[in-house]
A protein has these predicted regions:
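Basic/aromatic-rich interaction segments and small domains that mediate binding to polyanionic partners
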Residues: 1-94
């Protein structure tokens, strides 16, 4: 498996709002995070949702975001993070 991004690499979630079924939460789009794990390749869930074959398979990443970067006015600890599983087609180099 050849992954486009490596553990420790900074990425930005695409800020796109296509119609239909998407697996990327709105709240994380446009934000910068760091790859924590390359999970593996899986069938594309956005295609599977419509009864298609899910090909080509996409690489899934576990990406960590600082809470204070995601939520305006966040007053928790600056060490607080959110970890979101995101497919490669939603990520860009930071």
């Amino acid at each position: 498996m050849i992954a486009k991004f490596a553990v420790g690499e900074a990425v930005t979630v695409r800020q796109a709002y296509p119609p239909g079924h998407v697996r990327t939460p709105y709240f994380i789009r446009g934000h910068r995070g760091v790859v924590q794990e390359v999970v593996g390749k899986f069938a594309n869930p956005e295609e599977l949702a419509y009864g298609r074959d899910g090909k080509p398979a996409l690489t899934l990443y576990r990406v960590q975001f600082r809470q204070q970067d995601v939520w305006p006015g966040y007053d928790g600890s600056p060490k607080d993070t959110a970890i979101v599983d995101l497919y490669e087609n939603w990520l860009e180099p930071a």
